[in-house]
Regions:
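An alpha-helical repeat/solenoid feature that recognizes helix-turn-helix modules
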Residues: 1-38, 53-87, 118-145, 163-190, ...
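Long, well-ordered core segments of solenoidal/helical folds
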Residues: 1-7, 35-58, 93-117, 145-166, ...
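Non-catalytic propeptide/linker segments at domain boundaries
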Residues: 85-89, 93-95
Length: 205
């Protein structure tokens, strides 16, 4: 089978690459290797387009084109090691070829020319998936130029993203902490923020 994971349970729910990628990361991260887990892995690989279609991933199989968020989360599910590893020595940005994971990484690298992944095909910037890609590239030991640009962008935009309207976005801080670990950046001096105390002070009993 090629079972994927849907965003919500129930009749009519269709599997998507984002939900499947994060679910696979969680299941494989705790050592699960059942038939269903292997089917989700197959589903993720089938979401990746060939180089002639950019090498990115589609959100759902019937979509007409690739999706940046889906691309980042499929690669995160397939290749990221969690908790995030300390910074590895990274090879150059990858090129599209015969390996699907590398092709997907190549697509993401091509989308990180400014250091920030966009919400393509929608508007806006996606700092969460930028951070996810930093963590994944570090696990894969590739993408040196992309990672360097991305961590600078994350530091520059950390406060605006993680402290929007004066409220702590704990999910954003969590992604920034993982990106900091993956690049040997100080979590206590990250873009003018102490990520550790920002997160702990936001916790409620």
């Amino acid at each position: 089978g090629t079972t994927g994971v849907a965003y919500y349970p129930g009749a009519g729910a269709l599997p998507d690459a984002n939900s499947s990628g994060l679910a696979y990361a969680a299941m494989s991260g705790v050592g699960m290797n059942s038939a269903i887990v292997r089917q989700v892995r197959t589903y993720l690989f089938r979401s990746i387009t060939p180089c002639t279609e950019s090498g990115g991933a589609k959100f759902q199989s019937g979509d007409g084109g690739v999706n940046n968020s889906a691309s980042a989360q499929v690669l995160f599910g397939l290749k990221a090691l969690t908790p995030a590893e300390p910074a590895n020595r990274l090879a150059k940005d990858p090129s599209c070829g015969k390996n699907k994971s590398t092709n997907l990484a190549s697509y993401l690298s091509s989308q990180l020319t400014t250091g920030t992944l966009s919400n393509f095909p929608y508007d806006g910037n996606d700092y969460g998936n930028t951070a996810a890609t930093v963590v994944t590239f570090n696990s894969m030991k590739i993408g040196k130029s992309s990672v360097n640009k991305s961590i600078l962008s994350l530091k520059k935009n950390a406060k605006a993203w993680a402290l929007k309207n004066g409220q702590v976005n704990a999910g954003a801080v969590g992604w920034l902490l993982m990106a900091a670990e993956a690049t040997d950046s100080s979590p206590k001096k990250f873009g003018g923020m102490n990520l550790v105390t920002t997160l702990t002070k936001s916790m409620k009993k």
